Amino acid sequence: MAHKKAGGSSRNGRDSQSKRLGVKKFGGEAVIAGNIIVRQRGTEWHPGTNVGLGKDHTIFALTAGNVNYRTKANGRVYVSVMPKAEAAE
């Protein structure tokens, strides 16, 4: 009677942690300087005015304002921050 008694454990069962990539602030949302707008691998979205590009391609706000997404003729999507108009005092 040949029976297998001690089978090895499966070779699967591993996975990497999710990186939580994607858009964090959508068009029209208010941001302050330093807010992360998009986390990405590579430049799926490109930096426009009043935003910075981190070394990991994170796009973040440089000034307070509202987020704006714009597709240019070259097909690239540019992320900008439109500063809020200061209230006249």
Swiss-Prot record:
Region (Disordered): 1-21
PROSITE patterns for this protein: RIBOSOMAL_L27
Classification via Pfam families: Ribosomal_L27 (PF01016)
Keywords: Ribonucleoprotein, Ribosomal protein
NCBIfam families named among the record's database cross-references: L27
Similarity field: Belongs to the bacterial ribosomal protein bL27 family.
Full protein name: Large ribosomal subunit protein bL27
